[in-house]
Amino acid sequence: YPLRRQRQMCIRDRYYINGVLQPAPAVTIGPPLVINGITVPAGGNAVIVYEAEVNPYAPLAATGNIVNIATITGGGITPIEVTETVVTDNEPLLNITKSISPVPVTENGTLTYTFLIQNTGNTAADAATAAEIIDTFDPILSNIAVSYNGTALAAGTDYTYNEATGLFATTAGRITVPAAAYTQDPATGNWIVTPGTGTLTVTGTI
């Protein structure tokens, strides 16, 4: 799976000889990426450092990997090929959004905080992940009812809430979110990410 440079340019592109920084070498983006004008002194070494991002064809599932192949060529030497395998980051990747309804809020009315949790990672956020949602409600709610994915949660067991301060926290590991699903577009070859989701709702009186 080819690498592409972020915004079509290296974030960092460093060239060292025996540990001493050198002027940037000539680079052809490609693919393949080609770096020319490298000098390796007798008994010494040269190091090239650059960053790149993977393209949309790279597999994202837990078993996915990218094999990066580099070939060293030059006058009077036999080409040398080296490989490095980069595996996927196998962990949950969570993000959360919060919304309030109804808007506008009426005094002494009922208010609902809704938290949408999305997991774009290839690994589920299970109980062992010990994920928590902690928030200080403003406005503060009283007589709250809490549910996750439509299932009622119990105060003290599944969450804690302080009506004096508005501090709300779910019990570590009570919120679980499935892994994302990955499908490959048959026309383009790009991988499409469908996040795993969970919805926490907290309803109470202002």
Say what each PLM segment does:
Residues 5-8, 12-206:
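Exported/extracytosolic protein signature
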